[in-house]
Amino acid sequence: MAQQPESETAQPTIRRFRRELLDLVRRATLNLLTSAVTVAISGCLGPPVLERQVLGYDEVTRMLDEKLLLLNIARVSNQEPVHFTSTSSIAATFNWTATLGASGEVTESKGTNFLNLNIGGSASENPTFSISPVSGKEFTERVATPFQDTIFEFLVFQGGKINQAMRLMSAGIEVQKPDGRFVRFIENDPQRPKEYEEFRQIAAHLQWLNDNRQLFVRPLVFDETLIADFKSTPSAGDINNGFNMGLRWRQKPNGNYELTRLKGGRVVVSNFDPMALTDQERAALDEKIKKNPSGFVYLDIEPNGPGGNLPIQGAIKLRSMFQILNFIATGIRIAPEFEVSPNLPTEETDVGATATLKINVTDSPPDLRLPTVYYDGHYYSVNDTVWDRTTFLILSILFQTTIGRIENVGIPITISK
C-alpha cells in the first residue's frame, strides 16, 4: 500500500486544533460578555434604587413632621389635647440581583448561527419602622417649659426677622425699672387689643433698628473671676493646665495673681453694643438679668441711642411649645390677629403679615405643595405666602428642639413590611 504524504496525514489534526482553538475563543468571548453585562446591570440597578429609597424616606419623614404640627394645631383649635408621635428609626434592607444567560450554536461551515441571550434583574426592600408615642414627664416638661433666650438669639443671629420671631415666640414684654422691678406687662394677645397693638409696634420698631444695623442681639461675654488675689506665683503646670481649660492667670499691680475664665452670659437685645461696656459692667448686667428666668430675653432701648424715641427697658417673655401652638390655633377662629400700623410712620419697615402664621381651613384640598393635614372633615394648610412659609419653618425648628432625641420610650410600635 502506498504511503500517503505527510501533509495529507496532518490535515485532520490541524483542523481539529483549529476547531478547539475557535471554540475556546468563542467561549471566552461569551464569558467575558456575560460578566461585563452582568456587572453593568448590577451597577445600573443598585445605586438608583438606593438613592430613590433614601431620599424617599427622608421626604416622608419631613412630611410627617409637618402634618404632625398641623394636626396638633387643629386639635387645639377644637379644644382637644395635643399628642405627638415620632418615627424614631427606619431600617431597610435592600436586595438587588442581576442575571445573564447566553447559549447558542455556532457552526464552522456556512449556515445559520444561533445565539440566545437572556438578561434579567430584580430589586427588593424590607423596611422596618419604629413609631414612638412621645410622652412622659420629661417630654411634657419640655413642651410646657418656655424656650430659653439662647434659642431666640440663635434664630435672630441666623438672619431671621426679629419681629417674626417675637410674634411667634413671645407671650409679651415685661416692662421693668432699672433695678429690675416689675412695672407692667404688654401681652401679645389679640384678645387684649391695646396691649397687642403696642406689642406689635415695639416689634416693628426693633425690626426697623435691626434693618438699619442698629440693634444688637447677643449674649454677654465677660471674664469671670475665680481667684481674686492669689499671693503665690502659679507654677508652669498650673498655667498650662489652666490655659487648656480656658482659664487665664493674670498678674495684678500689687504683684499677686488673679485667675479668670471667659464666660458667656445671658442674651441682651439693645440699641448699644454690649462690648462697649467694661468687663465689670457686663458682669454686673448679667447678674441683674439672672434675676429673671432663662425664658426671658433682656430688652434695653436707651433714649440716648438709635431708636431712642421709643425707649423701653424690660424683658421679652418667651412662650413654651404648647403656648405657641395654642396661640396659632386660637387665631384660627377664637381670636384672629388684626392689622397694626407702625407707631412711628417715619420708620419704613415691613411690619409683617396680619397673622403670625395663618392656617387656612377648607372643605377641599389645597395645593399639593403646601403643608396640609385632613382632620375632622376639613383640610388645615399653611397659607401660601413667603411670610407664612417662613414662620412655619421657624415653628418646625422649634418643634425639633423641643422633641430632641427620643429615648426611654416604654412601648415603641414596630412595623415591618
Where are these regions (language model features)?
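Alpha-helical and His/Cys-centered functional microenvironments
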Residues: S7-E8, R15
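N-terminal export leaders
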Residues: F17, L21, R26-L30
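C-terminal motif of bacterial Sec signal peptides marking the signal peptidase cleavage site
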Residues: A40-G43
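Low-complexity, intrinsically disordered or signal/transmembrane-proximal segments
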Residues: Q3-Q4, Q11
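Classical Sec-dependent N-terminal signal peptides that target proteins to the secretory pathway
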Residues: T34-V37
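N-terminal amphipathic/basic membrane-interacting segments and domains
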Residues: L45-K417
